[in-house]
Regions:
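Bacterial N-terminal signal peptides that target proteins for export
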Residues: 1-10
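Compact alpha-helical subdomains of small soluble proteins
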Residues: 64-170
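Hydrophobic helical h-region of N-terminal Sec-dependent signal peptides
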Residues: 12-17
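Immediate post-signal-peptide N-terminus of mature secreted/exported proteins
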Residues: 25-59
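N-terminal secretory-pathway/extracellular module detecting exported/lumenal segments
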Residues: 2-3, 23-36, 89-92, 144, ...
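N-terminal signal peptide c-region/cleavage motif recognized by signal peptidases
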Residues: 19-21
Length: 171
């Protein structure tokens, strides 16, 4: 059993290292919210499987289906913009990395992970749907996506870059 756990942790660590940063570019606020929502969803999914909280996860998925779908589409769109044809595989690697990291947290200290997960399910299931992104952002694990939010300065710099001038063709 111990060797099996060690193998899982080693595999998860390698997978998370290979996945690299979540995005090659900075993300806007709505994309960051979508990433935080996906991190929360992954954490709760691992909690459901690890801690026997499938009923709570199903209640979460039913209650927040609309928000999860909306943020999922936003996340898919962000990865398509950032990576073009590689958007889907990069998104899949990102989601896998999040699940692996949540699994690592559960394995590292299950005695703490499961009670915290129960508290988190309680908070989430008592949260109005519109407030779920704020709850997701407040979690200590929400920054595990490693995405950097665009600042006004970055946005200003990007908009001030001009395309190179082209010479007019002479007739």
């Amino acid at each position: 059993m111990r060797n099996h756990r060690t193998s899982i942790v080693a595999l998860a660590t390698v997978a998370s290292l290979l996945a690299g940063p979540a995005m090659a570019r900075c993300v806007d606020n709505s994309e960051r919210q979508a990433m935080n929502m996906r991190v929360l969803q992954s954490e709760l999914m691992v909690a459901a499987l690890t801690c026997g909280q499938q009923g709570e996860f199903n209640a979460f998925a039913r209650k927040f289906e609309g928000e999860l779908v909306t943020h999922g589409k936003m996340l898919r769109s962000a990865f398509q913009r950032a990576y073009g044809g590689q958007g889907e595989p990069r998104l899949n690697a990102f989601v896998t990395r999040l699940a692996n990291e949540a699994s690592q947290r559960s394995i590292a200290d299950r005695a703490v992970f499961c009670p915290r997960a129960a508290e988190l399910f309680n908070v989430v299931l008592n949260t109005p749907p519109a407030a779920l992104p704020a709850v997701a952002e407040q979690q200590s694990f929400s920054s595990t996506h490693d995405a950097t939010e665009c600042t006004a300065e970055v946005t200003r710099e990007a908009s001030s870059v001009k395309a190179p001038a082209t010479k007019a063709k002479s007739r």
